[in-house]
């Protein structure tokens, strides 16, 4: 594929991916410092903030990706040269990068302001939780063809683990950072996220033919 096609296609997909939900999530994260005092926070308190609140960032920014095709976007112009899989993965990865940077910015400020915790395990673990919740919501949105279904599915998983403390989800427990500074179960959640996005990427062309 020539550079003349790649550049405008990348810009177009960037414009599609950067949704108003990004602005909403940024505003919500920016408001967090108003309600906390980092000097008084230990590792467990920061973990609760990340796992219970910041992780919902993923549910805000991911599900709409499952409905981008419903608006009749202009990728048909490149249909003979561009496969859908890399485009969908580009959008998902771009959103994952946004989540990681947003989480890193917030926790870097909290850490620098006096909170006592290991920074990067907290950033990575919280970002993975946000991404897997969002990917679950994205998958439900795609399968149901309805944005509300995505929000309900993602939040249902969140609520299930919040109330049962992982008794029903086992190694796929979302909030492992509450137990230790780094939970190896996060790697399973990261793998599940990749599995879900690959499923979505392969399923979406079928849905477009329905």
What are these regions (language model features)?
Residues 65-76, 139-143, 169-179:
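A cytosolic-side transmembrane-helix exit/cap motif
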Residues 147-191:
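Transmembrane helix segments
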Residues 76-84:
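Short helix-to-coil transition segments within interhelical loops
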Residues 1-9, 84-85, 115, 131-132:
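Juxtamembrane loop-helix boundary motifs flanking transmembrane segments in multi-pass membrane proteins
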Residues 34-68, 89-154:
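Secretory targeting signals
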Residues 1-51, 56-67, 139-142, 165-166, ...:
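Hydrophobic alpha-helical transmembrane segments
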Residues 111-117, 174-181, 196-200:
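Short alpha-helical linear motifs
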């Amino acid at each position: 594929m020539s550079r003349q096609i790649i550049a405008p296609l990348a810009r177009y997909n960037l414009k599609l991916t950067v949704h108003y939900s990004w602005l909403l999530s940024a505003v919500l994260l920016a408001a967090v410092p108003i309600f906390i005092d980092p000097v008084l926070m230990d590792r467990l308190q920061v973990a609760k903030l990340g796992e219970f609140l910041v992780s919902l960032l993923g549910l805000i920014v991911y599900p709409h990706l499952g409905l981008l095709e419903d608006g009749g976007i202009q990728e048909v112009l490149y249909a003979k040269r561009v496969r859908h899989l890399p485009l969908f993965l580009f959008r998902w990865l771009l959103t994952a990068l946004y989540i990681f940077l947003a989480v890193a910015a917030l926790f870097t400020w909290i850490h620098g302001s006096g909170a006592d915790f290991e920074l990067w395990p907290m950033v990575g673990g919280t970002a993975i939780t946000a991404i897997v919740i969002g990917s679950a919501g994205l998958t439900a949105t795609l399968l149901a063809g309805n944005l509300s279904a995505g929000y309900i599915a993602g939040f249902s998983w969140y609520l299930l683990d919040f109330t049962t403390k992982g008794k029903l989800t086992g190694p796929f427990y979302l909030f492992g950072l509450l137990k230790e500074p780094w939970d190896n179960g996060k790697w399973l959640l990261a793998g599940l996220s990749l599995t879900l996005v690959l499923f979505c990427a392969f399923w979406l062309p079928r849905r477009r033919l329905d």
